[in-house]
Regions:
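Alpha-helical transmembrane segments in inner-membrane proteins
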Residues: 2-282
């Protein structure tokens, strides 16, 4: 038997095992997708004004035939809330998975960068100083805009420092922790000078809620996720190589620092847009 035949015989079990692994993953993905669809339908059906499955399907296919009250409940309340939960969960889930991969730490999350605390600081400033009027922004968007700006600003600081001092795991984590403590101190200072009404609004915002969801906000969060997902898929191989260690990834030609900075930028964008519209959630 030739050497090629020996290699083929040795590789056959590996190929079979890999196919089984991929099949199991696909089965799990299909099952989870079906569970998500079922949970969404049940969520839309459930509430003080309950809908049957037939009413939900008919309302989705023929919205003009619904009574005004039923139309508002289905299309303006329950569907935006349900879809916002899906797209925000997708953004935070993908962001968390990428953070854990590039930092090689199963405990890493978008909060590691201080993005959520920065968003809270931006929202607190908008609430306490009533920045909607002087800037001419719609009142429903002023808090999300400042929350997003704060989150992006904190991410920019982390990215700049990481680029200057090297985007190693220790560098990113230490800068993130330092930024978190600084932001927490500023948030507490804002809360100290806030009046009772503003303080109540800040507390409710930090608790997170889907009740602020609208179709426009769902579209914005969904668009950011749709832009980030293909970029994540393109870098799957490089991130998988990075799980074996930086030296291992570099031996395969992966630019580790550039990959880590790219992922951190993507994670920051997804986290910022999700937190801006729902508050500190997840």
């Amino acid at each position: 038997m030739s050497g090629a035949d020996n290699l083929a015989d040795m590789g056959a079990p590996l190929a079979t095992g890999y196919r089984r692994f991929v099949t199991r993953r696909m089965v799990w993905l299909c099952a989870l997708a079906a569970a998500l669809c079922l949970a969404t339908v049940v969520n839309v059906m459930t509430g003080p004004a309950g809908f049957s499955l037939g009413q939900v399907i008919d309302g989705l296919l023929h919205p003009d035939a619904l009574e005004p009250g039923a139309y508002v409940i289905l299309w303006e309340v329950r569907l935006p809330f349900a879809l916002m939960a899906i797209v925000v969960g997708a953004c935070l889930g993908l962001a968390g998975a990428e953070m854990q991969t590039v930092l090689n730490n199963p405990l890493a999350s978008p909060q590691t960068l201080g993005v959520m605390y920065a968003a809270t600081l931006g929202a607190s400033l908008a609430i306490v100083f009533n920045l909607a009027a002087p800037l001419g922004l719609p009142e429903t968007y002023v808090v999300p805009v400042f929350a997003f700006a704060g989150a992006i600003a904190s991410a920019a600081v982390i990215l700049l420092l990481s680029r200057v001092y090297g985007a190693t795991v220790d560098t990113v984590i230490l800068f993130g922790i330092a930024l978190v403590f600084a932001l927490q101190a500023l948030i507490q200072l804002i809360q100290f000078v806030a009046d009772s009404d503003s303080l109540q609004q800040i507390v409710f915002w930090t608790m997170g809620s889907l009740t602020r969801a609208t179709w426009e906000k769902v579209a914005i969060v969904g668009a950011v996720f749709a832009l980030c997902l293909p970029a994540s898929i393109r870098q799957v191989w490089a991130m998988t190589a990075l799980r074996g260690g930086e030296d291992y990834a570099r031996s395969y030609g992966v630019a580790v620092d550039r990959l880590r900075l790219t992922v951190l930028l993507r994670v920051s964008a997804m986290t910022a847009v999700a937190v801006a519209f729902t508050g500190v959630i997840g």
